[in-house]
Amino acid sequence: MNKTHLTDQKFSDFALHPLVIKAIENQGFYHCTPIQALSFPITLAGRDVAAQAQTGTGKTLAFLASVFNYLLTNAADETRQCEQPRALIMVPTRELAIQIYTDAETLSQFTSLKMGLAYGGDGYDKQLKILESGVDILIGTPGRIIDYAKQNFIHLNALQVIVLDEADRMYDLGFIKDIRWLFRRMPPAEKRLNMLFSATLSYRVRELSFEQMNHPEYIEVEPLQKIGSQIQEELFYPSNEDKMRLLQTLIEEEWPDRCIIFANTKQRCEDIWGHLVADGHRVGLLTGDVAQRKRIQILDDFSKGYLDILVATDVAARGLHIPKVTHVFNYDLPENVEDYIHRIGRTGRAGEKGYSISLACEAFASHLSTIEACTGHRIPTSEYNKEALLTDLPQPKRLQRHHRHYAGSRNQGASRKPRSPQ
């Protein structure tokens, strides 16, 4: 972590359980991020919190440390059965569930707390087998949790802690009815510790917190700065015919160590994938219809550096926590400003420098005014020389449905280097 991203307060300054502090410090973390420093005084006192915080601010550790602390310092009901988890963490996507589970495993290394996953699309029986053996902490998506609950594989009436992460996205994906169904099967709000985290504390998110929480305290982390100062934004206005060539030229010029390219539709993502693979790049494709096992493999390969570029839609990439992403390309400008903020928030994480490059073509340039109005600043604009765009590009490859969704190898002879930080 960059020191500018941290506060002067240490984890050991708070009344966290010694085993929680030991696990955190064992990972080399000693100082809190702002969201952690603000939330711990509330959650460690047993009070509810509703927090506005962007991804990359340390919010996952903020609520995981609070969950572990509560379970380690408050005994479970003596009548609790194995099908009754003590804590539930609800998230909008399976990728986010898996990432939080991985972080929780690290935090649990010195405890006897057991954890389970519940997400759709894969591993139904495997997940169920773990749940039937009994878990203290259940992490999952609303749909699969409801599935298990309706079949009485799990019961939520002994829950001591609830976390709702990315609450704003739960609305966007239509999960709120499911979430309310689950809340009705839990103990009353005053009988549990409730935590809500969201990129925005909009009216509907605050309404949900009022309904389902016990007088929550609201906190915000840098609410006036939606885009981190460490992210350098750049905007181009390409014609439709120049757009793909401009993207490929920029990639050649920037030569990013690790980048994510966002597009608004699955078809557009597949087109980009085909052009980049044909040009010799190592590329992964992440859209809504990619099978879960392939998604996990692609993300793992991208994180480990076997892939250099990830092409993704917003829904498929929501909640991803991938370190060291140097560049984000908005091939299409999103209609939703929150999607724009989420996209470019994949880079410049933990105080590191990041670059966001957007292409405002004829089809999506109309979205720019809303984005700039909501973020409160104009995106710096650059011009390109049409004559300097790459021309000797191979024909794009077509995606074979029975093949893995990535291929290619980076051209080892390329001489261009990434832009130096300014």
Swiss-Prot record:
Positions with a binding annotation for ATP: A53, Q54, T55, G56, T57, G58, K59, T60
Group of enzyme by EC: hydrolase
Compositionally biased residues, Basic residues: 398-407
SMART domains: DEXDc, HELICc
Domain Helicase ATP-binding as annotated: residue spans: 40-219
Any Gene Ontology CC annotation: cytosol
Region of interest called Disordered, as start-end residue ranges on this chain: 394-422
Places the protein is found: Cytoplasm
Residues of the Helicase C-terminal domain: 245-390
Motif (Q motif): 9-37
E.C. code: 3.6.4.13
GO process terms (BP): RNA catabolic process
Reactions catalysed according to its record: ATP + H2O = ADP + phosphate + H(+)
Any GO molecular function: ATP binding
Annotated function: DEAD-box RNA helicase involved in RNA degradation. Has RNA-dependent ATPase activity and unwinds double-stranded RNA.
Similarity remark: Belongs to the DEAD box helicase family. RhlB subfamily.
Protein name: ATP-dependent RNA helicase RhlB
Species this chain originates from: Hamiltonella defensa subsp. Acyrthosiphon pisum (strain 5AT)
